[in-house]
Regions:
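PTP/DSP superfamily signal
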Residues: 94-98, 119-191
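A structural signal for well-ordered alpha-helical segments within the folded catalytic domains
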Residues: 84-87, 111-112, 145, 149
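Intrinsically disordered, low-complexity regulatory segments
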Residues: 6, 55-65, 177, 183-191
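Helix-loop module immediately N-terminal to the HCX5R catalytic loop
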Residues: 53, 57-100
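Short catalytic/ligand-binding loop motif for oxyanion handling, primarily in non-cytosolic enzymes
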Residues: 41-42, 67, 108-112
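Catalytic cysteine-centered active loop of the rhodanese-like fold, especially the PTP/DSP P-loop
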Residues: 92-121
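Glycine-rich, flexible N-terminal cofactor/catalytic loop recognition
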Residues: 2-54, 59
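Anionic group-transfer/hydrolysis microenvironments
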Residues: 36, 62, 104
């Protein structure tokens, strides 16, 4: 299974990858969006030590499809993505340039941000095509549903983007979502 995959839309491309791959290949891109946990230390964020680095957008939000249970939902380290995060990602995109979107595993947060960008590029009415393109780029993608919901609202897609993602759900993706939530909540002591 490849660690990263790309698609061309216009003269640029979108690649979705895990952090370790992104760290090695970062100079091959014009723009990078990194999705990190809110408590990620600066030294763990991709760094550039040579001149002329790619443009970098750092987004910090937890990989949960819905908020942690109260009272944990107010904790800074369990911050969900916001509309501002999505606006930043969409404004950061340049379709003519090579874009890398990464998160820790390259499966959920990065695929949801990439889907928002694909849907934005393709325009209203093409939500199923955008989701199809996402799964062509990254067959193992399990896009973060909270991020997809935000993108759907921000792009005024009337639920069509979220519906297109949910139509592709499998028992495996549902199980991955469940295990991911359990792991996050256990890690942050929310049991």
């Amino acid at each position: 299974m490849p660690h990263a995959s790309a698609t061309n839309l216009g003269s640029g491309s979108i690649t979705i990858a895990p952090y370790t791959w992104a760290k090695r290949k970062k100079r091959e891109f014009d723009r990078i969006i990194g999705c990190y946990d809110p408590d990620t230390q600066r030294r763990k964020i991709i760094q550039f030590h040579l001149p002329d680095p790619p443009a970098l957008l750092v987004l910090k939000f937890v990989d949960l499809d819905e908020p942690a249970p109260p009272p944990h939902d107010a904790r800074k380290e369990l911050r969900l993505a916001s509309g501002d995060d999505l606006v930043s990602a969409l404004e950061f995109d340049r379709p003519e340039e090579r874009l890398l979107v990464h998160c820790h595993a390259g499966i959920s947060r990065s695929s949801a941000i990439a889907l928002a960008i694909l849907a934005g590029r393709m325009g209203a009415g093409n939500e199923r095509i955008a989701v199809g393109e996402l799964f062509r780029i990254k067959p193992e993608a399990v896009p973060n549903l909270h991020v997809v919901t935000l993108a759907d609202r921000l792009l005024a897609r009337d639920g069509q983007l979220l519906e297109a993602v949910l139509a592709c759900e499998t028992p495996r993706s549902r199980e991955r979502r469940r295990l991911n939530r359990e792991a996050y909540l256990a890690y942050y002591g929310c049991n």
